[in-house]
UniProtKB/Swiss-Prot annotation:
Origin species: Archaeoglobus fulgidus (strain ATCC 49558 / DSM 4304 / JCM 9628 / NBRC 100126 / VC-16)
Keywords for the protein's UniProt record, in alphabetical order: Membrane, Transmembrane, Transmembrane helix
GO cellular component: membrane
Domain of life: Archaea
Protein name as catalogued: Uncharacterized protein AF_0763
Keyword hit for Transmembrane: yes
Protein topology in the membrane: Single-pass membrane protein
Cell compartment(s), UniProt: Membrane
């Protein structure tokens, strides 16, 4: 009997089931991880914006007095809330009250809000990220806030930083070790 060049029906059936399953998994696997990629991108944007706000005094040094809602589109600036001292340099996590109120004022104007988003790196060619910042007591009660309206649902990433504020009477944060302590929260979404 000649058994050469014959395939069994079981082998063909098993191979076709394996290939069909493999192609199905290969087609749908990238869709499973699409949300994870968005979360990672949103998380990095939220971290970057929070770091820029609390670790940078802004550009130019007098941006909080030179920029207002009438010239925010024509002026080039980068908002930063950190205090800059000539002797000590930038004091990270130590925020200037007038810069906080200026950022809140700019974010209340829709044209300025888009400009601030652009200068914080949140307007890319593919996505226009929205963001919201708030200064809160440590129990999460808001003191100062600004930005886009937070949606009820969706993929929102928040990043918190504990900060000091230079003027406890203007922004009444909690007093800890003779310093005015608040929580800065930055939320980013698409």
């Amino acid at each position: 009997m000649d058994n050469q060049a014959k395939l069994s029906l079981d082998l063909l059936l098993g191979l076709s089931i394996f290939l069909t399953t493999f192609l199905f998994v290969a087609n749908f696997l990238p869709g499973i991880f699409a949300d994870v990629r968005h979360e990672i991108a949103l998380g990095s944007h939220a971290y970057r914006v929070a770091a820029l706000l609390v670790e940078d005094p802004g550009y130019p040094d007098d941006w909080c007095t030179a920029v207002d809602t009438s010239n925010c589109i024509s002026k080039e600036f980068r908002p930063g809330l950190a205090i800059f001292d000539e002797n000590n340099g930038t004091e990270y996590n130590y925020l200037n009250t007038s810069k906080i109120f200026k950022l809140q004022e700019l974010l209340s104007n829709s044209a300025c809000r888009d400009t601030v988003r652009n200068y914080l790196g949140l307007n890319s060619t593919n996505f226009k990220y929205k963001f919201y910042f708030s200064l809160k007591y440590l129990n999460d009660t808001e003191i100062v806030s600004g930005g886009d309206n937070l949606p009820e649902m969706g993929n929102i990433i928040k990043f918190d930083r504990l900060v000091y504020v230079d003027n406890c009477t203007a922004i009444p944060c909690e007093s800890i070790a003779e310093r005015c302590v608040c929580k800065l929260e930055v939320a980013v979404w698409i």
